[in-house]
Amino acid sequence: MAGELISFGIQNLWNLLSQECELFQGVEDQVTELKRDLNMLSSFLKDANAKKHTSAVVKNCVEEIKEIIYDGEDTIETFVLEQNLGKTSGIKKSIRRLACIIPDRRRYALGIGGLSNRISKVIRDMQSFGVQQAIVDGGYKQPQGDKQREMRQKFSKDDDSDFVGLEANVKKLVGYLVDEANVQVVSITGMGGLGKTTLAKQVFNHEDVKHQFDGLSWVCVSQDFTRMNVWQKILRDLKPKEEEKKIMEMTQDTLQGELIRLLETSKSLIVLDDIWEKEDWELIKPIFPPTKGWKVLLTSRNESVAMRRNTSYINFKPECLTTEDSWTLFQRIALPMKDAAEFKIDEEKEELGKLMIKHCGGLPLAIRVLGGMLAEKYTSHDWRRLSENIGSHLVGGRTNFNDDNNNTCNNVLSLSFEELPSYLKHCFLYLAHFPEDYEIKVENLSYYWAAEGIFQPRHYDGETIRDVGDVYIEELVRRNMVISERDVKTSRFETCHLHDMMREVCLLKAKEENFLQITSSRPSTANLQSTVTSRRFVYQYPTTLHVEKDINNPKLRALVVVTLGSWNLAGSSFTRLELLRVLDLIEVKIKGGKLASCIGKLIHLRYLSLEYAEVTHIPYSLGNLKLLIYLNLASFGRSTFVPNVLMGMQELRYLALPSDMGRKTKLELSNLVKLETLENFSTENSSLEDLCGMVRLSTLNIKLIEETSLETLAASIGGLKYLEKLEIYDHGSEMRTKEAGIVFDFVHLKRLWLKLYMPRLSTEQHFPSHLTTLYLESCRLEEDPMPILEKLLQLKELELGFESFSGKKMVCSSGGFPQLQRLSLLKLEEWEDWKVEESSMPLLRTLDIQVCRKLKQLPDEHLPSHLTSISLFFCCLEKDPLPTLGRLVYLKELQLGFRTFSGRIMVCSGGGFPQLQKLSIYRLEEWEEWIVEQGSMPFLHTLYIDDCPKLKKLPDGLQFIYSLKNLKISERWKERLSEGGEEYYKVQHIPSVEFYHRVLHIFRSVGGDITGRLLMR
């Protein structure tokens, strides 16, 4: 494996040496000799890599080669950079440079010559230990095996493919939680990769479990957990979102008290995923009171975590898959076409496949990974070769798995790493930077990879860095080495993470290759670390980092901080780290707020992030960083001075500016023609004309001020044909123009945010036809926008937010909005009348109407029939909405709250709400009577009623809803509904009836993410 990684490094160094000849004037002979030596060196690598496992000396040679390659890249790149910097210097600097040119070139000539000498020595050493040379004609060639492995995989990932043979386990676990009242804690234990988390997720999402419990919480505990973090997460899950800030400010004692009170009075299921030690469980469990309304489901590799000698504790140990189930799972992944009518598996492949899965020992993860490797192997010869490799990797032919020895699984999973193309090996190893269970942002990861030169030039071909990153992540996902799912809105992989066992492999390989050093302020740090000579340094969860004291490696290429909050940077001198390519200081606090000017000496830097940093002053020396492709200065809540030095960073692909730079800051950005993402661009600090040449932009966020007209904006961004996401926020005058004044003629635009005064939409041509997401706010549209918007055939999500529409009537026409799935109508204060024609919005699933106080009634007919979730708040409906909503045969969740209905009587008719499962009614202050006819709501399992002061009795029809499992209602009903009470007969069949002393805070907008964003603006 090291040989392929080195081959990748040689390729990069070869590319550096193959630049324009004029760059190497004065050192031409040394460069030519170095290229010849590299060509010679590459011919020894294959055999050296094969022999390094049996020869410590050869292994040392391979390690020395890696160091030579790194040093070579540093030397050549520094020489080229200094040449280019000299060309762009002023006259005085050029004169000084000419005076130093001879000694400088002599120094580099000696340095390059030294590299050749080191290569010659390592070749002699390898030859003396029997390493054979393979003849390579011409220039450096990538190994043929790489080219074969780089073919795109042809199998598709089945989302349920790992759920094989586990149905009986799910049924048994659900039974423990739902049917056995004496059981309090159920632990699922077994080795990593057994499918414990998959099993727990199936149970967590099971309908019977959802019916049984009022509150559900899922917590990933991990090795580095703190008790406060776990308790806070549980309370956030069980409490409404609006209390999150209050929860985060609680002391530990207050937090414990709140949780105890909550768990004493409600039925809650808490899932604690991946607890490592018995002591961890002992730290967490003080929040659980003796009252037995709560239950815990936990997963662990350690059986002793929650072992007790009483019947309230159950330890469940899933067995490995049977041979038959293993074969079924393997076929789903390795042979995705097996269900096609014409498909017939080759007999030899079947024999080899069944032989290979024996090495997996029934472990689902190992089977998935093995299947992922074989899915791209089309011939029996390929399968036979891999079968032989698996046998050679297994020690002593072990096939049994246990918690004491995971070598077999590691070998199988490691083989999936060996099968990766060399560039994907680098991509995979980079994931070792991140802590356990960490959700990695794919966009950031893509720029890390690009900054380190991992991307192959042939993969660019006009693509953005994010596009290339998506291709790489997709390959890793398809090989089941990385876990990720495409985001519904963007169709991209937005985040990813590693399975525990695959992370172990990643850390192991990173250690073998001395790929990075990990330091953590957490009590339990990464269990596999490299030495301090690593070229990459990762600090996880620091409180303080002292650069001069904590980092003592002048050859460092990457310094990355992973954190969940702010931290202090002490001794902010980077003078000894001049070879850095990646510097990520997210959420850093710098004393005095001024970034040190020595940052300008990091001329190799490609990636610099000061996102959310407490920095008030960026130095002028930042302009020296000509190679930057990623610069993130985004900050909120404070003004940050940024000097006008960005125009020279012509390699920039990603630029995020501070949200507030003050009126005095003026930035020239017209040279940044390679930008793909530009965040927080403000016309207060830059000219709109600078945008004209940024034709590669795919994401643009603009803040307008008073002096800017929409016509000027339209002229400036009209040529940005590759825009996919556009946000425009108007912080200036409300009277820019009486017309829209801008045509969004972007054929690739999918997501559009507009917060600006735009009282009219003349035609649908204002919006591109491929738009999938549209948010409008503060537009003050005078005419109904629906006739225009409903013609957007690809629109899936629409929000008309605060003051977006000032008219009274909206009509959704027949056939309109053919793809719309979510509709949010928020704070439309003048809106009174809504008409929906038949066949409008046929795919609508979620409807959210909030603070539309003049809306008196819903459309009597033709509400989209496929609606599954509806939330109505502050709407003041005069007519009973239930007869209309009851006809929605797919509706599963309904929330009516906060004076939404101002009438007296509501009726649920017989046969109405045939699929409704959850009904929440609260704060209807005029509501007096509720009639539920027999046959209504046959599948209702959860009912909330609270703060409806004029409602005097519950409907008799409740006694016929036998599916009802949970009733939550305010304390004033306790006497009437308790045993012996006059209405007890209506609720005696309900397993759980709970009474509350205070108002239930159960508000949860179905469009919660949209509402949250609205409130943050």
Swiss-Prot record:
Keyword Lyase included in the entry's annotation: no
Each LRR repeat, start to end: 602-627, 649-674, 675-699, 768-791, 792-819, 841-865, 937-962
Domain NB-ARC: from-to ranges: 147-460
Pfam families (alphabetical): LRR_14, NB-ARC, Rx_N, WH_DRP
Key words, A-Z: ATP-binding, Coiled coil, Leucine-rich repeat, Nucleotide-binding, Plant defense, Repeat
Annotated ATP binding sites: G190, M191, G192, G193, L194, G195, K196, T197
Source taxon at top rank: Eukaryota
Keyword Coiled coil attached: yes
Entry's Gene Ontology molecular function annotations: ADP binding; ATP binding
Family matches, as SUPFAM superfamilies: L domain-like, P-loop containing nucleoside triphosphate hydrolases
Coiled-coil annotated spans: 25-52
Any Gene Ontology biological process: defense response to other organism
Role noted for this protein: Potential disease resistance protein.
Family membership: Belongs to the disease resistance NB-LRR family.
UniProt-recorded name of the protein: Probable disease resistance protein RF45
Native organism: Arabidopsis thaliana
Gene: RF45
